[in-house]
């Protein structure tokens, strides 16, 4: 039906007859000549219809937005005054000789030009229209190029594309599972995989050595802008490779990806320990474009007569950190109050501050409600450590270390945006040496997952001091977004059982939930390691989209619903009976 894509017609085709198909992007009658912008996935081309062909001209006059049409015509150069350098096809136009309406279009329920006025609900309900917008189409085309590159790279480096099951068994991986009832085993359920973690480890135990898969994963969790109930991972696992070798291979893939698709050289990725990232940036995924850093000042404040500072300064689990913002002395009291409310979202109970108005004036040049609690030497040392200058403001976070990290880390990001401090376009890094466990509610939880190997300890040493253990794990971070995370896996049955016990999973529960894994570990398991990238986040970053929904063809809403298909929906009652399932009525709300 066509000879060329609309966006591919160029000066080399001048004089040629072309056949194009696509949608009417815009049609306008200018002095008896009709100009038609025809659009397909590759772009736009201008088609001109003269009244010399009255039958064709009449058809062109009847066109409205989003009619699906076929055009036949001859390519010609545009007059110099009409060349459009903003269009890929802006040097040429097609003189229309024939026109066929393939399918008419009703008036649209949403605007494809002024899409900012469309609600998110409408965009998802009429997703097939929203995806016609060039911006959306180009993102999905770019996504296809990313997956094509990944497959070529993986294939070229000896990795095998192997599928793993979608119907599997529920395992504790941090989020709720989507459950699928079994008809043949009434009362029992499959789970949709949160990741192929255990199956890819079993593939290493099976001897396949290098595996990858671009795979759907499912998590029934509360949604945010960067979360979806179903998402896509670039999943990788290797045998007989160290963590450094896995990082080298996957870093090379991402660097080559950016170079090929965006002509961007990311350079070598620096490595930073988890401790350093949390201390300097208050985050395990720091945005290095932001030059602001947290500075520890607790040692200066242990003896001050201000409990807000001295309390955390003398608490083993506490921290007092300072954050200097260049030019921040211009902030009004209301703006400071707004920042105080902002850090309160992250658990902070307040936000002390100090404006540096005139260093030459000594203490008199400092403006702060807490200055009266600090002697001149302390103030001078705080200014020296933070490298504050005239016109700066210093904010203080004082609380438990985790609260300070989260609240001041968030303030660092917000201030960096508000004061337009971000430097450079792309700043990747590796974050390594994560804690093996974190403690909450009197028990230990795995920071990554229960199959991550500790670094440099025996099973006995791990069990004796789990809170001190460091995992052989690594996260790739780009511009404050975790692109992917991985680790060396446990390949020893005793170590795996020890980790289960530390996590409160006794031998009986471990056998019931992970018996197949523990069995497999008895038969010559190779050392193995891997990593998984979030494809949606990667494409979101590379295309500059504001949400992963804008790089997915048919995403869900923030309430995990699909307005297009009205999913989820009610099941057929007969099917529920066959499955042995009864739906309980909603309990009435208690007054």
Curated annotation (Swiss-Prot):
Top-level EC class: ligase
Short name of any one Pfam family annotated for the protein: tRNA-synt_2
Single GO BP term: aspartyl-tRNA aminoacylation
Subcellular locations according to the entry: Cytoplasm
Residues reported to bind L-aspartate: 173, 219, 448, 489
Residue numbers binding ATP: 219-221, 228, 482, 534-537
Its EC number(s): 6.1.1.12
Record keywords, A-Z: Aminoacyl-tRNA synthetase, ATP-binding, Cytoplasm, Ligase, Nucleotide-binding, Protein biosynthesis
Catalytic activity: tRNA(Asp) + L-aspartate + ATP = L-aspartyl-tRNA(Asp) + AMP + diphosphate
Keyword Methyltransferase: no
GO CC term, one of those recorded: cytoplasm
Quaternary organization: Homodimer.
HAMAP family with a match to the protein in the record: Asp_tRNA_synth_type1
Family: Belongs to the class-II aminoacyl-tRNA synthetase family. Type 1 subfamily.
Function: Catalyzes the attachment of L-aspartate to tRNA(Asp) in a two-step reaction: L-aspartate is first activated by ATP to form Asp-AMP and then transferred to the acceptor end of tRNA(Asp).
The protein, known as: Aspartate--tRNA ligase
């Amino acid at each position: 039906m066509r000879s060329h894509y609309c966006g591919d017609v160029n000066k080399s085709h001048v004089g040629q007859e072309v056949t194009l198909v696509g949608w009417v992007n815009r049609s306008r009658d200018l002095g008896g000549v009709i100009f038609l912008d025809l659009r397909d996935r590759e772009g736009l081309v201008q088609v001109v219809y003269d009244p010399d062909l009255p039958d064709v001209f009449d058809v062109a006059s009847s066109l409205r937005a989003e009619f699906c049409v076929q055009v036949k015509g001859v390519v010609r150069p545009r007059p110099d005054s009409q060349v459009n350098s903003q269009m890929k096809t802006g040097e040429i136009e097609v003189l229309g000789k024939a026109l066929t309406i393939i399918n008419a279009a009703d008036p649209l329920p949403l605007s494809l030009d002024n899409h900012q006025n469309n609600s998110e609900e409408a965009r998802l309900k009429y997703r097939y229209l929203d995806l016609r917008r060039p911006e959306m189409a180009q993102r999905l085309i770019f996504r296809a190029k990313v997956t094509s590159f990944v497959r070529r790279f993986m294939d070229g480096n000896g990795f095998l594309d192997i599928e793993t099951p979608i119907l599997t068994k529920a395992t504790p991986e941090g989020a709720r599972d989507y459950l699928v009832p079994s008809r043949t085993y009434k009362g029992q359920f499959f789970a949709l995989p949160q990741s192929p973690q255990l199956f890819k480890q079993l593939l290493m135990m099976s001897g396949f050595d290098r595996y990858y898969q671009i795979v759907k994963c499912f998590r029934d969790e509360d949604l945010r802008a960067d979360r979806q109930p179903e998402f896509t991972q670039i999943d990788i696992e290797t045998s007989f490779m160290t963590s450094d070798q896995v990082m080298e291979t996957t870093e090379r893939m991402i660097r080559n990806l950016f170079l090929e698709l965006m002509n961007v050289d990311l350079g070598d990725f620096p490595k930073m320990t988890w401790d350093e990232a949390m201390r300097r940036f208050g985050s395990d995924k720091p945005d290095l474009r932001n030059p602001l850093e947290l500075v520890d000042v607790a040692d200066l404040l242990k003896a001050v007569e201000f409990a807000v500072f001295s309390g955390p300064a003398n608490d083993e689990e506490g921290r007092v950190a300072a954050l200097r913002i260049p030019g921040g002395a211009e902030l009004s009291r209301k703006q400071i109050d707004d920042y105080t409310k902002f850090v309160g979202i992250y658990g902070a109970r307040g936000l002390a501050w100090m404006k540096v108005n005139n260093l030459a004036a000594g203490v008199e040049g400092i403006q702060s409600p807490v200055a009266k609690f600090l002697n001149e030497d302390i103030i001078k040392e705080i200014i020296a450590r933070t490298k504050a200058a005239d016109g700066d403001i210093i904010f203080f976070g004082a609380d438990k270390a985790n609260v300070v990290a989260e609240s001041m880390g968030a303030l660092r990001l917000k201030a960096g945006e508000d004061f337009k401090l971000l430097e450079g376009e792309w700043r990747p890094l590796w974050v390594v040496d994560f804690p093996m466990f974190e403690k909450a509610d009197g028990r230990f939880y795995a920071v990554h997952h229960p199959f991550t190997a500790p670094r440099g300890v025996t099973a006995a040493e791990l069990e004796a001091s789990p809170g001190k253990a460091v995992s052989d794990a690594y996260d790739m971070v780009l511009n404050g977004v975790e692109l992917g995370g991985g680790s060396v896996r446990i390949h020893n049955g005793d170590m795996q059982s020890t980790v289960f016990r530390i996590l409160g999973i006794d031998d009986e529960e471990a056998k019931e939930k992970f018996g197949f894994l523990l069995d497999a570990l008895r038969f010559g398991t190779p050392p193995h390691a891997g990593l998984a990238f979030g494809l949606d986040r990667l494409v979101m970053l590379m295309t500059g989209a504001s949400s992963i929904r804008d790089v997915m063809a048919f995403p869900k809403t923030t309430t995990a619903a699909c307005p297009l298909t009205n999913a989820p929906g009610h099941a057929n009652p007969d099917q529920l009976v066959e499955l042995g399932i009864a739906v309980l009525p909603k309990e009435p709300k208690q007054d």
